[in-house]
Amino acid sequence: MSQLCLSVQSDDFEYCRALVQGFMQDVVEIRLEPCDWKEEQLKELFSCERNVKLMASFVNPTQLNMTAAVERLSMAILSGADYVDISLAIPEASRRWLMTLALNKGCKIILSYHNFSCTPKTEDLRKMAEGAFKEGADIVKIVTTAEGPEDCRRILSLYPHFPEGRLEAFAMGEAGSQTRIEAVTKHKAPFIYLAPGRETRTAPGQYTVYDFWEEEDIPLQGDVDRLPASKSFAQRAIILAALCTGTTRLYRYTPCSDSESALRVAEQLGAEIVREGDTLVITGHQDIRRKGLILKEDTLFVGESALLARLCIPLAGLANRPITITGEKSLLRRWVCPYKTLLAQFGLKVEGERNGFLPLTVSGTLKPSPLTPINGKHGSQMISGLLIALSLCPTRSQLPTFLRIHHLTSRFYLDLTCEVMGYFGLEVPDFPEEQDDANERTYFFGTGQQARPVVGLACEADWSAAALMMAAGAAMGDVTLHGLNLNSMQPDAEMYDLLVEQNSDLVRYENGDINIRKGLTVPFDYDITDTPDLLGALIILALRANGESCISGLERLRNKESDRAKTFVEEFRAIGADLFIAEDGKLYIEGSPSQLLRGGHCSSHGDHRLAMALAVADGMSRRKVRIDDLACSGKSWPEFPEELDKLFGRKRK
């Protein structure tokens, strides 16, 4: 009976080991050409406990790497390889040496010929196979390149001349892909070679693991034609547009609770809002340099958005009177102002009945300070507000204003703030000297700048939403995402990089679309400090990894819509996931490629990220996952329930 053989060609030792120990089918082939590992690593890989047979190969040896080929194959044999693929391009004396080692270690011998340019004559191929069997091969492998049907017919014509199950003959290239199937279905070839994904094929025309999943393994299929606009981007752009004098057009806007709250704040700042389809026309009337910040009332209502609250607290210092910041729902339970002492250095007094919780009243006048050190451990949102407010501050300083931030978390959100500020003509350059620590930033800028309206600015698609859909595709689907900016400053674009590092079955097309399919996920370690909104996507991905994954940096999750680390663990455990927070403060998740959760009732705790992650987990569960409040997903993606139903092929009543 033919065996599935996973072909792995990577110099990443940990990745190779994870696949060897986690692949649950028949054989894993390690292509040793790129594996410039230490001897101890080769020994460890080929001697490790595993559920599969392990094949060592060095497919294309040349004079330049012949010594490496023989040495690596020898070490693999001595360390416990079950099969060794010895190329006929290796000199005869070295082949005999390798075959002797294999015989002594009980390792099956494959003698192979690979032609990467054409398919030679049938007689030549037949003589080559006969010679390999006479040399002592257990299996002979003849692989050529097909240009058309005649080449395919020629390679498959070898089978009747040799014992069943001992010849592996097929053609590479797209024209030859069908020979791979016919070799096993009609001719009982010993193996069919699969790649982990399309970008990790070892040859053109090779099938991938995805092609051999059962239909029930791929419950999630389809296109996400329009991801929501990034609320992180939209909120910053809306507020900055309201701080201008003149009209800004913001394209590709999609409403969500937090972005709509930003529009209400803009109106409280005196801006006029006109909606033209998915375009926002925002006309601001501020002249902060001459008049200070003008508000319609003494209160700014920010809805449920912590970002808005933290942007508005420093901005309130540009008004000429006390301003009260207030909100609603879960925001009233969140500590929104951890920087009262810092703000006092800039002349602001922040007061409230509950220390640091809304409502808060800001009084005083914002004044620049030449050099201010900031401990950024409480996040970047208030610092973003300071960058905007200080840039617009009409009080001029004789010296440039410096903000020196250390222990910075969510640092990429500061980069996003600076990018959007730049669109509106506000300059906040990094300090030119090298920063030794990625979690340190020094900004310097002049005060008294004027925000200028933008003729046209497109909202970026939301990478937080995209990350969850990409994780869902990698775990159980075939999903295509449209409209993403791969050069985005949004922190959650890191998910794309993680999936590439994971060798996920991911393809980026020329038009920018991204397709991701279920492949083989290996366990991973990830520090979530700078990307706290990725937690749901990471858990979904980890649940389908072949082993234990670890997420650190959970401190950033305690002051979200819920105590996010705690509630994610509680609710995913409620539906059958194996995950826990250890004494070291890290989250450990046990996964399995075929794992099915129990399902059942669970709570979103009013947290839109948790609600969406649990809804995705429904596709990995035996029973329906029933969430008490999926509607809270509207905080960032109102159309999420309908979009997910479309991908699952369900009709919503």
Predicted regions and their residues:
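Acidic (Asp/Glu)-rich catalytic clusters
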Residues: 18-24, 37-51, 74-79, 96-106, ...
